Design a protein with these regions (language model features):
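Short beta-strand segments in beta-sandwich/barrel cores
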Residues: 261-262, 278-283, 297
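Transition-metal
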Residues: 1-139, 199-227, 251
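Loop-centered beta-sheet repeat module
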Residues: 147-195
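Short acidic-glycine-tyrosine-enriched beta hairpin
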Residues: 157-169, 284-304
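C-terminal amphipathic alpha-helical segment
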Residues: 195-263, 267
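Short, basic/aromatic beta-hairpin or loop at an interaction surface
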Residues: 138-150, 268-279
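His/acidic/aromatic-lined binding-pocket segments of jelly-roll/cupin-type domains
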Residues: 87-88, 96, 118-121, 159-160, ...
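Ligand-binding loop in jelly-roll beta-barrel domains
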Residues: 80-82, 90-95, 104, 125-128, ...
């Protein structure tokens, strides 16, 4: 079964910029594109297959039809017809709200299906781009509520100057916000549970403040303080470099300028490749060939045993 490409869902937002369309080499007229949903099984926002014999089918339809052949037997037992990951590109022309996501346990207690753990990988961003990630000082839930009320919550959160290649892991409970000028790839659990903590007192087009979820968020926040929330890793050429390993996804980055064959014969999972830079050709063990270039995301079925990658190409690899 050949690797699958999808028609991305472009989302215009009040904070969206102009980086996504040229990055994805698209010939479309759409302004303020803040997000490109690359591979999604979120109900109502399912991406549609763009190539091969399954062209025109929604991702969740394909999971239902192919089951473990597509996602892996263990994943199908765990998630059923729901695809477990959501892949996005995000371009922030303005600051996004400060947010937190619940753990699976807390989400179920609050009547939600599951929580959300995610990660960010920075693409070429503005020179002065920053983001917020994790508490930098010990606060109590009571102090948190007071800081939200008096507009000082940002003082308690670590702010990072960011550049291309930076990586941040966001386990459920870690407070965070994407800042102005950030352009990034996001890998997350399939979940729409987001609690907005603070929105910089902004008003929508109707003059209303956006809803905050201060109380729900207080239960979700991990109040532990860490010295560094940025993932430290050493870039390497022509090999996979692990960025994140967690129960929800495992992610590595590859930066290739010579051919490489990746062995998936022992892996019981789909694999997603997210193009970051350059262009390459991938050929699977059945002889199916497709291109992978910056701005493209490819779903490799679980039945695939090997992938040969050729070309000058940099990409993320993620699987469950």
């Amino acid at each position: 079964m050949e690797p699958l490409k999808f028609n991305a869902l472009l989302k215009s937002t009040i904070w969206g910029g102009e980086k996504i369309i040229p990055f994805k080499h698209l010939d479309v007229q759409q302004e303020n594109v803040g997000e490109s949903w690359e591979i999604s099984g979120v109900p109502g926002n399912e991406t549609v297959v763009a190539n091969g014999e399954y062209a025109g089918k929604k991702l969740n339809e394909l999971v239902h039809e192919l089951k473990g052949k597509l996602v892996g037997e263990a994943n199908y037992k765990r998630f059923g017809d729901e695809f477990p990951l959501l892949i996005k590109f995000i371009d922030a022309r303005q600051d996004l709200s400060i947010q937190v996501h619940p753990t699976d346990e807390i989400a179920k207690r609050q009547g939600k299906e599951r929580g959300k753990t995610e990660m960010w990988y920075l693409l070429p961003s503005d020179a002065d781009a920053t983001l917020l990630c994790g508490l930098k000082q010990q606060i109590t839930p009571t102090q948190y509520a007071e800081m939200v009320e008096n507009d000082t919550i940002c003082d308690a959160i670590s702010r990072y100057d960011v550049k291309e290649g930076d990586c941040f892991f966001l386990p459920a409970g870690r407070i965070h916000a994407i800042g102005t000028g950030c352009f990034l790839a996001e890998i997350q659990q399939t979940s729409d549970v987001t609690y907005r903590i603070y929105d910089f007192k902004r008003k929508d087009k109707n003059g209303n403040y956006r809803e905050l979820h201060t109380k729900q968020a207080a239960e979700c926040i991990n109040y532990n303080v860490e010295s560094n929330y940025r993932t430290e890793y050493t870039p390497q050429k022509n090999q996979g470099v692990s960025l994140v390993q967690c129960p929800y996804f495992n992610t590595a980055v590859y930066d290739l300028d010579e051919p490489m064959t990746i062995d998936y014969s022992e892996l019981d999972s789909f694999v997603i490749l997210i193009g970051l830079k350059g262009e390459g050709t991938i050929t699977d063990n059945e002889g199916n060939t497709t291109t992978l270039r910056a701005g493209e995301s490819i779903l490799v079925p679980a039945t695939t045993e090997t992938l040969k990658v050729e070309g000058n190409v940099k990409f993320l690899e993620t699987y469950v």
